[in-house]
Amino acid sequence: GLMPEEDYDLAGFAVGVVDKKDMITGENLKPGDVLIGMASTGVHSNGFSLVRKVFEKELNKEGLETYYEELGTTLGEALLAPTRIYVKALKAVKNAGVTVKACSHITGGGFYENVPRMLKDGVRAVIKKDSYQIPPIFGMLAKKGDIEEHMMYNTYNMGIGMVVAVDAADAERAMEAMKSA
């Protein structure tokens, strides 16, 4: 439909170029390589149809400005936390001399659809869910919407916005580079 005259919709995108020699293809990925997850800032830009359904009653000025102790902020601030951009961290890893063998931006389809895309045949991922903190917005969504864990991981990034694979010998150096970025 048409938007009211006083409303607006804002969208943006970026286009990049990469030399073929610098492409991250996953072809050198092997069993024993290490996956490193980079923290997300929250929901990012996916799963908002479900967010709207779950928080239907709160999607007004009063509801969005309500402070929630478990979030440490208002619902509106938690839902609209800017999407983290990972280019600085990836550049820092490259500048540290670490080869990123494969990577996956955890967007639509969540963990369960995106991580397998970075893997080549014969390689599987083992994710230790207790190795990182899940931002509280996801717990609130799951509880309020009565959403099963599998569906949450199939829809949202669950606190990890990007996953990279590196050689086990390079894992510590890669993580230090990411922290410094």
Residue ranges, per PLM feature:
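Glycine-rich anion-binding loops of enzyme active sites
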Residues: 1-49
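Glycine-/charge-enriched secondary-structure boundary and capping motifs
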Residues: 3-10, 60-80, 84-181
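A short, terminal or domain-edge coil/loop segment
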Residues: 14, 45-56, 155-162
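Glycine-rich beta-alpha junction loops
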Residues: 16-18, 33-35, 39-44, 52-55, ...
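Residue-level recognition of conserved structural "scaffold" positions that shape functional pockets
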Residues: 23, 49, 54, 115-117, ...
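Acidic, glycine-rich loop-and-beta core segments that form the ion-binding/anion-interacting portion
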Residues: 29-77
